[in-house]
């Protein structure tokens, strides 16, 4: 009898603990990663950039997809190669999942041309159908980095918009 009671109590506890509750995730908009709960859905600003194959890439290419974004430059001697290698591990891990993509923005578009990005992609064996290395106008890339991804922790409105952006973060979108 006691076993039946314990079974029923266990089943009741199990069922109650499986209750699905919907909670909104915070997004982070400050350098210290303090979450900001917002009632309005945050969106990555519209962009139109060029990938390592010379193709135009826009927000529409990522609509309905989960993607991981980052900011890098091809001549970076420090963290960028490590980030690229880690992103490559993720690309390989999700190579058969069409819902997951990758997007790497150069922060040195004056140097990282389409051909430079193409060579960089070959060096790291990047699958261009899944992972876009993008370049474009510096102002557009930096606007998207600051307003969309909050990637420039040191940027203040009174500071120069020409400040160099460099971050070691991946952004899950």
Language-model segment annotations:
Residues 84-144:
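Structural microenvironment flanking redox-active thiols in thiol-disulfide oxidoreductases
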Residues 51-52, 173:
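Short, acidic, Ser/Thr-enriched surface-loop or helix-capping motifs
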Residues 1-46, 50:
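N-terminal targeting signals for export/organelle localization
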Residues 59-87:
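Short active-site neighborhood of thiol/selenol oxidoreductases, capturing the structured segment around
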Residues 14, 45, 58, 72, ...:
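Conserved Rossmann-like nucleotide-binding pocket used by diverse enzymes
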Residues 138-173:
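Thiol/disulfide oxidoreductase modules built on the thioredoxin-like
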Residues 44-45, 67, 167-168:
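Short loop/turn microsegments at loop-to-beta-strand junctions
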């Amino acid at each position: 009898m006691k076993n039946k009671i314990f079974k029923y109590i266990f089943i009741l506890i199990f069922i109650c603990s499986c209750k699905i509750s919907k909670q909104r995730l915070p997004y982070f908009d400050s350098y210290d990663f303090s979450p900001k709960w917002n009632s309005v859905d945050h969106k990555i600003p519209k962009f139109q950039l060029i990938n390592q194959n010379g193709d135009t890439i826009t927000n529409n290419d990522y609509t309905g997809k989960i993607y991981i974004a980052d900011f890098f430059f091809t001549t970076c001697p420090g963290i960028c190669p490590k980030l690229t290698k880690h992103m490559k591990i993720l690309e390989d891990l999700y190579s058969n999942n069409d819902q997951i993509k990758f997007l790497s923005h150069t922060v040195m578009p004056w140097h990282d041309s389409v051909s430079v990005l193409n060579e960089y992609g070959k060096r790291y064996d990047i699958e261009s159908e899944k992972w876009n290395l993008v370049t474009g106008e510096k102002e557009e890339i930096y606007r998207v980095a600051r307003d969309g991804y909050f990637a420039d922790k040191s940027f203040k409105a009174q500071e120069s918009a020409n400040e160099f952006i460099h971050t070691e973060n991946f952004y899950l979108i």
